[in-house]
Structure formats: C-alpha cells, structure tokens
Amino acid sequence: MKREIAVGTRVSKLAMWQARWVVDRLKELCPGCSFRIVGIRTLGDRILDAALVKIGDKGLFTKELEAAMLRGEIDMAVHSMKDLPTELPEGLVIGAVCKREHPADVLVSRRGKKLDELPGGALVGTSSLRRCAQLLWYRDDLRMVNLRGNINTRLRKLEEENLDAAVLAYAGLFRMGRQDAITQVIPFDICLPAVGQGSIGVEVRSDDGEVLELVKKIDHRESRLAVFAERAFLRRLEGGCQVPVGALGTVENDRLRLEGVVATPDGKQLVRSFVEGNGGDAAAIGLRLAEKLLELGAGEILKRARQEERRE
C-alpha cells in the first residue's frame, strides 16, 4: 500500500494508546505501510462537567471521528467498542474487532475494601447508569456519585472528593498500566459489562477495499462474534448511555453464550437472562435474548427509564 494511512482517534491517553496498539499490529502485518495518528476531540471529550445521561446523545465519543472519515480526512477510526453506537452512518463499517481484553468492571477502593466490605451508605463514583443500577440492585444502601474524566482524573477525584470507591473498566486500567489500583474485579453475577466493553474496534469506509483488507488481518473472530451478539441485543432494546443495559457474550468451541441485563437506574427493578447458540448466529442470538428479556418485563423498565430521563 503506497499511500499514508491516517488513523483517527480521540485525544485521551487511553484512546491514543489504543490507536498506537492498532498501528503496531498493522505494521507487523504490513511492514511497508505508513501510518499517521490523528487526534480528534469529540463532544464527549469537551463536556466533562455533566453526567453522560444529562448530555443525552448517542455517538458522544464517535461522531466527529466518523465525520472526518466520511470527509476523507482519516482512513480509519479506532474506537472503544462500547462507545460505538449500534447504528453506523451510511458508508461506514466495522472492519475489525480486535482480541478482547477482560471485559469486567473493577472496584477501586480508597481503603482497600471490597464491595461487600464497604460501609453502609458508602459513596461510590461512576459515570455509568448501568453500573449504578446493578450495584444498587446488589446493595441498595450505596450512594452513587457521578464521576467522569480520564482514568487518572477519576483516580484523583476518588481522593479529592472523599469517595469510598470508584468503579472503572478493567481494560482501561490494564492498558494504562494501573492494575495496581484495582481492589476487586467485580464478578459478572453482580455486574455485567457494557456492550463491547474491553474491545477495540476499527471503523472504516465501506468502499475503501485496501484499508478493509488490511484491518481484517487484526480481526479476532471470537471477540467479533461475542461483540456483534451484544450489539444486536442492544440495538433491539434501543438502549444507549442513558439506559441501564449490560451484556456479555462468550464463545467457546464455536458455541456462543450471551447474557444480558436491563434495570431501572435506581436498581429497584432488574431482569436478567441468557441464551446460547452457534457462534455464526451471533446477531440472531442477540435478538433472541432481547425478546426474552422484553417478555420478562424489560420493556416496562426501559419505558420507565426513558420517562425519568425526559423529566430530568
């Protein structure tokens, strides 16, 4: 490939790390290729003084990257898959889902206490309604506090704002070399992750055959099947940052197991179940699980969540 390939990414340290990681993998497979990383500030990067639910928009961390790609300013965009809306703009596709890092949430506690050891009424920081809902379902005495910013900012605020603990994604801490901060990996039976959590995705123009062929080389089939099942599940439920939805797909011997949860933001109502099937049927499995949860009452939960969102 003769042309220089422009790789778009958000400007945070974690996003830049992920873009460099992708470029390093591509260079291994295409030593003669030339890459240039382009940092682009997104709406979600610019608004840091409000909870994600208050901003109320999908694509908070991706729209500007996608617009730049459609204008031809960049050739691919590297995303955290959990940030990428389930509906992509016309002309763009997911060219690769890289091998997934551990998708769990983790507790970072100021005094080294695990979730069950936190005092009654403990202050727990997170920007995620999904985490709030599931943790309040598990422990309704916790007091959840909005906590946004990059990893180092959140770890600093944990101390400055006198919080007892914060909940972050394992993958981000691992990639930033901050595993030392982790007090506890929260079990999946307490808190299912966000759709796509732990996965790096590469979005490309659908008509750019050269770049498509290149990025396909770093696609990890099992990760892609799991994430695509999760995204199909989320798409059917029409959930975004504003609705507490979690999911986790796992693939073993080409069998896909998908578990999902829908809850009210206050954690008072929660439905959770799973389905299994052939790995090649990822999208259908996602739809099956969504329908199953809707039958169990997820529709009413989502309706209530959206009504509360509009009132706010």
Swiss-Prot record:
Cofactor note: Binds 1 dipyrromethane group covalently.
GO biological process: protoporphyrinogen IX biosynthetic process
Pathway: Porphyrin-containing compound metabolism; protoporphyrin-IX biosynthesis; coproporphyrinogen-III from 5-aminolevulinate: step 2/4
GO MF, one example: hydroxymethylbilane synthase activity
Cofactor: dipyrromethane
Modified residues (S-(dipyrrolylmethanemethyl)cysteine): C241
HAMAP family: Porphobil_deam
Additional detail: The porphobilinogen subunits are added to the dipyrromethane group.
Name the record gives this protein: Porphobilinogen deaminase
